[in-house]
Amino acid sequence: MHRVRNKPVKSTATASVKHLIKQRGGDGATAASKSANDYNNNDSLLTDMQEPSIDTDKLSYEIFSILESKFLFGYDDSKPEPANSVVAGSIKNQRGKICILSIDGGGMRGILPGKALAYLEHALKSKSGDPNARIADYFDVAAGSGIGGIYTAMLFGSRDGNRPIFKADDTWQFLTRNAKGLYGGAGILKRVLRTGSGCCSGTAKLKKVMKESFSELTLKDTLKPVLIPCYDLKSSGPFLFSRADALETDGYDFRLSEVCRATWAEPGVFEPVEMKSVDGQTKCVAVGGGLAMSNPTAAAITHVLHNKQEFPFVRGVEDLLVLSLGMGQLLDVSYEYDRIIKWKAKHWARPAALISNDGAADTVDQAVAMAFGHCRSSNYVRIQANGSNLGPWSPNMDTDPSGSNVNMLMGVAEEMLKQKNVESVLFGGKRIDEQSNFEKLDWLAGELVLEHQRRNSRIAPTVAFKQSVHRADQKTSDKDIGVTARER
């Protein structure tokens, strides 16, 4: 379970106010001196009781505007001294950026972020000149929920402690290869209504596939920090599987095969997972991560900002570079009133789950965009489908393994990459960007490669990952070897 490490953040609002007063020059000091003399002169007391001057009102207004902007919108003085600007830029370059990958939860729609990951990995190979480049080489932290959690384990899990097991193309292919075994040919809703249980056969298939993929690997066998959520029925609360916690104690180290099953154990689709840590001390009865955290971006950002042990030089969101991959807003053609007014509880089950998950994910997107403020466009990228011309869509598209649904989702994935990127705007809803999602991913790949190259020339390492000692028998006897890890 992930424990947040809190540390007070020093505000710079006071410095901004002092800078503004200083810009006003000696006027403020002269006024203060004159006021002191007036208090020693009884004839001046009436003057002190007069209404404030227009200049004083203006100064007060500007000061309070700075304070308001700082604490509400992350304001920074827009006109610092030129020399200080150069120094600040140099220091920021030395700090570098922590690169974060976040993947939303979902079912068959996981084909969409899988295709985006495949394109990004291709772009990384092209821009770096390294044909063996992998997603894990360029990201410092990865978080995934549901199918996104499985993708995270696939891209960052390692058998040799050096290279990841899977390529980005393996993610979406995992879904297309195993769809019928996981969801069955008849469709989950029909099976539930006919037999009363739609999850036994899918659970057996998921357990088999995860065991084949990860064997006895645990959270310690991931190359970088990973965060994968589930909902723990035992404690009635979210449970966040974390590599950082696993390296601290075996009581928080779990097998990756069980972690993946836990985060994807959507009620009614797959059975809950009863699991325990490798030392048997921590127990959990898990259902899907989407119930607790359909969009884990905020959890990943919080992990970095409060983890000074592994990310010692991070000062704020301006030191982050975040890619968040969503499942897409595709249900824009359904739900006519005359139709849904006749629905019973069984008809609402799947649509309600989709609305809840997508709504929660969108809320996190809005909140994260607000947190980044003025550096949103340069430090935070959200990629997901924004509608599609290939519908109409069924509320059961996440659990429909049919060839027609798979082919449609493959087409939507290609359409998504060509669509204009959509950004969340502070208090302003959504804004269509000039760049397409293809172009955004190309730009991001360039930034990731540049950050990777700069780390070799910095005075101090940007990250200081606690390392796990790899053992040939894949068991979990690990220790902190005190190594400061530069990027692979």
Curated annotation (Swiss-Prot):
EC number: 3.1.1.-
Major place of residence: membrane
Pfam families to which the protein is assigned, alphabetical: Patatin (PF01734)
Tissue: Highly expressed in roots and at lower levels in leaves, stems, flowers and siliques.
Active site: S145 (nucleophile)
Disruption phenotype: Increased length of leaves, petioles, hypocotyls, primary roots and root hairs. Changes in lipid levels and composition.
Membrane topology: Peripheral membrane protein
Molecular functions per Gene Ontology: fatty acyl-CoA hydrolase activity; phospholipase activity
Biased composition, class Polar residues, residue ranges: 32-47
Record text about domains: The nitrogen atoms of the two glycine residues in the GGXR motif define the oxyanion hole, and stabilize the oxyanion that forms during the nucleophilic attack by the catalytic serine during substrate cleavage.
Organism per entry: Arabidopsis thaliana
SUPFAM superfamilies according to UniProt: FabD/lysophospholipase-like (SSF52151)
Keyword Plastid attributed: no
GO CC, one annotated term: plasma membrane
Region of interest called Disordered, as start-end residue ranges on this chain: 23-49
EC category name: hydrolase
Record family assignment: Belongs to the patatin family.
Listed GO biological process terms: galactolipid metabolic process; lipid catabolic process; phospholipid metabolic process; response to other organism
Name of the molecule in the record: Patatin-like protein 7
Induction, per UniProt: By the fungal pathogen B.cinerea and an avirulent strain of P.syringae pv tomato.
Domain PNPLA residue range list: 101-301
Entry's localization field: Cell membrane
Annotated function: Possesses non-specific lipolytic acyl hydrolase (LAH) activity. Catalyzes the hydrolysis of the galactolipids monogalactosyldiacylglycerol (MGDG) and digalactosyldiacylglycerol (DGDG), and the phoshpolipids phosphatidylcholine (PC), phosphatidylethanolamine (PE), phosphatidylglycerol (PG), phosphatidic acid (PA), phosphatidylserine (PS). Favors the release of fatty acid at the sn-2 position for PC. Possesses acyl-CoA thioesterase activity.
